[in-house]
Amino acid sequence: MDKDLNTGYYKDFDTNFEQAYSLLEKNFSHEELLKLLKDGNIPEKQIATFMFDEVNTEEDAEALINNLTGCDGKIREAVALKIYQILSSSKECLKLFIYPKIFAQATIDINANICRLVVDSAKFLKANEEFAINYTDEIIKITKSALDELDKFIFRDKKYVINKQLFKLYWCLESLKNFYEFVDREELSTILEKCAQNSEYTIREKTAQLVRFVGSFPDIEEQLKKDENYYVRCVFD
């Protein structure tokens, strides 16, 4: 049976399933799970994440955070779910997850399920001012970069390249619903004005939701209330 040395996956589904099942049957200690999270292959890291129920130290939190970006999507999604479960159920753990740059990068993951879990997890860390300020700063940088890239695109550019920036912009706007207080008002106004003029209606719809949520940009609100798209206008109904 051929095995990919980088991922730990076998080429046939049944073998991968059997390996995962055999791991689930084992009783791992916390230290063993921690080691698998650090050094395991893809199936091992997935199973270790699902079984990792205690986060008591910075080392525990770091082992999860280090697998939130820059690794296989199966691991990233499992870790994003686990972090959400931990932060939503334990206030004591919040101080261990102050990694604003990593959270910001994970906010724009290519997997929308991960984006949603990370945005919802970040809300629990908002009370930590250091995290909130630095996370928001990173999100604003990504937002501005996406807007700049979209300004450069022309009709001949490939659709997937444009969609990549729109996807980033969408999730940045979603995250700003929770952190808009940490953005300079003029800067936020400029961003919202640009987004309100975007040709993609989902961006205008997300902008309308943010404008309505913040409630202090009447000119942009009036513009979006008259938008050509039904779903954008419906935000204010």
Regions picked out by a protein language model, each given a short descriptive name:
Residues 1-5, 24-36, 57-67, 89-106, ...:
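Amphipathic alpha-helical scaffolding segments comprising HEAT/armadillo-like alpha-solenoid repeats
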Residues 221-237:
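Leucine-rich solenoid repeat scaffolds
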Residues 7-25, 43-57, 66-69, 74-93, ...:
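Structural detector for internal amphipathic alpha-helices that build alpha-solenoid repeat scaffolds
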Residues 13, 41, 99, 114-115, ...:
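Generic alpha-helix initiation/capping and coil-helix boundary signal
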Residues 76, 106-109, 145-149, 198-199, ...:
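Short, mixed-charge aromatic SLiMs
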Residues 189-205:
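Short, positively charged, low-complexity/disordered linker segments
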